């Protein structure tokens, strides 16, 4: 448990009761089929033997042209129409570029990984789609898997795919693992997996650096309560680490109650620097233990971990928020490069709100308030536009200061819209009359809100 639980204002248990989450419903891309009933479909469990048999049958079954439909009770011999749905495995082998696999709602129980193979690609302007049908909620449930690094949930090794509106839980390793490039992952929820909820990395140990996943967009997604049962130091909310290329973006994503970090952008000496990652409009809170209190002494608990092994990578973090994480809000984690942080807010984290001990980092319009330890800000404080927390008080070279009165509310309230977007209400929003409004450079406010 957090050592700070005795603080009635900020204690983990007290806050957990005050934060409400509204899970997003899926959105259909394209036509809304209002004439088709949204019935509750039964669950089905596929063993490894059944998956193998399904794959064999799928190879000999020609599915309907165009969009395909799958359901928990779909049959591999069905053509994949809405009235006669097929299986997910069969649909993945035959969907054409520019077409969509629609998943009906219900529980899809698997004991082995669902893989979109290398070479199973869409194209620029003609993505292959794996999308929840209407407002229904398809749940890919891998709880039957054993804990182990080979037991991922959904593994996307192909390029140019849209994955939207899915819930993925219980995997023996990562919930979703992305080894392909130019994919769009939207409004997904990954939780209670036994490693990072959603991770990017090379599809094979033999993949060259030019094949590392690049130009993927993770949008409006939520990753929570992921925990590895062996040591509690591996399972993050989101990770683009070890073996990722350039151009990967996280936008409007939420990471909470993961046993290790919210985001992990770790580089390792053995594999060298990763490509620069961009994080926008995202929130990390209460990482370092799960919502039921699971943690270990090894659980780091950073909101945004932005490096590793003293390797330079110039990441970008903008308009993002870290609060009440076990350790740091934003940390360079030994990355001595030039990380650019713009209009971020960090509040009440277990150690420093901003921990950048070394490097040539660039800080613009960031706001730190009520950290447990002083901020460390090696680099350029552009135009003295940042308000830091040092020696238990705010500091700014131009005389700006932050107090509780500068915020409409310091009571966390987080919901998600139907599209998965984060809704914060008045939480950490600057109050009318605050001198932080309009004091940014070259214009605008200081902080994320």
UniProtKB/Swiss-Prot annotation:
Keywords assigned: Calcium, Lipoprotein, Lyase, Metal-binding, Palmitate, Repeat, Secreted, Signal
Cited SUPFAM superfamilies: Pectin lyase-like (SSF51126)
PbH1 repeat boundaries on the chain: 158-179, 180-202, 213-242, 245-267, 274-308, 336-358, 359-391
One annotated GO molecular function: carbon-oxygen lyase activity, acting on polysaccharides
Catalytic temperature dependence: Optimum temperature is 40 degrees Celsius.
Reaction(s) this enzyme catalyzes, per UniProt: Eliminative cleavage of (1->4)-alpha-D-galacturonan to give oligosaccharides with 4-deoxy-alpha-D-galact-4-enuronosyl groups at their non-reducing ends
Name this protein carries in UniProt: Pectate lyase L
Originating species: Paenibacillus polymyxa (strain SC2) (Bacillus polymyxa)
């Amino acid at each position: 448990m957090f050592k700070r639980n005795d603080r009635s204002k900020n204690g983990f248990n007290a806050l957990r009761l005050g934060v409400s989450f509204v899970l997003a419903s899926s959105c259909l891309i394209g036509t809304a089929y209002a004439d088709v009933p949204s019935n509750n479909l039964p669950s089905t469990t596929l063993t490894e033997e059944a998956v193998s048999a399904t794959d064999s049958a799928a190879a000999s079954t020609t599915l309907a042209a165009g969009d395909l439909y799958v359901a928990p009770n779909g049959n591999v011999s069905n053509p994949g129409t809405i009235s006669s749905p097929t299986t997910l495995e069969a649909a993945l082998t035959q969907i054409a570029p520019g077409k969509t696999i629609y998943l009906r709602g219900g529980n899809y129980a698997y004991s082995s990984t669902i893989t979109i193979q290398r070479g199973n690609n869409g194209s620029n302007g003609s993505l292959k789609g794996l999308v929840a049908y209407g407002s229904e909620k398809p749940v890919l449930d891998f709880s039957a898997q054993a804990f182990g690094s080979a037991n991922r949930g959904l593994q996307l090794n192909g390029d140019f795919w849209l994955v939207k509106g899915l819930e993925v839980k219980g995997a023996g390793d990562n919930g979703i693992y992305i080894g392909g490039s130019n994919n769009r992952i939207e409004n997904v929820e990954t939780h209670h997996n036994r490693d990072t909820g959603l991770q990017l990395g090379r599809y094979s140990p033999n993949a060259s650096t030019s094949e590392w996943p690049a130009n993927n967009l993770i949008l409006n997604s939520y990753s929570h309560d992921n925990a590895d049962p062996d040591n509690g130091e591996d399972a993050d909310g989101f990770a683009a680490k070890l073996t990722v290329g350039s151009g990967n973006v996280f936008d409007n994503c939420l990471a909470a109650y993961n046993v290790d970090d919210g985001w992990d952008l770790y580089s390792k000496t053995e594999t060298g620097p990763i490509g620069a990652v961009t994080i926008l409009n995202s929130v990390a809170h209460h990482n370092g233990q799960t919502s039921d209190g699971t943690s270990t002494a090894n659980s780091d608990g950073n909101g945004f971990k932005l490096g590793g092994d003293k390797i330079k990578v110039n990441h970008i973090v903008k308009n993002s928020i870290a609060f009440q994480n076990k350790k740091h809000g934003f940390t360079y984690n030994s990355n001595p490069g030039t990380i650019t942080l713009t209009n971020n807010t960090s509040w009440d984290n277990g150690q420093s709100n901003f921990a950048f001990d070394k490097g040539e980092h660039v800080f613009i319009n960031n706001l730190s308030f009520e950290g447990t330890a002083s901020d460390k800000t090696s680099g350029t404080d552009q135009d003295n536009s940042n308000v830091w927390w040092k020696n238990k008080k705010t500091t700014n070279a131009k005389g700006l200061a932050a107090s509780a009165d500068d915020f409409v509310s310091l009571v966390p309230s987080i919901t998600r819209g139907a599209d998965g977007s984060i809704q914060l209400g008045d939480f950490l929003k600057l109050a009318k009359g605050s001198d932080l409004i309009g004091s940014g450079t070259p214009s605008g406010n200081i902080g994320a809100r």
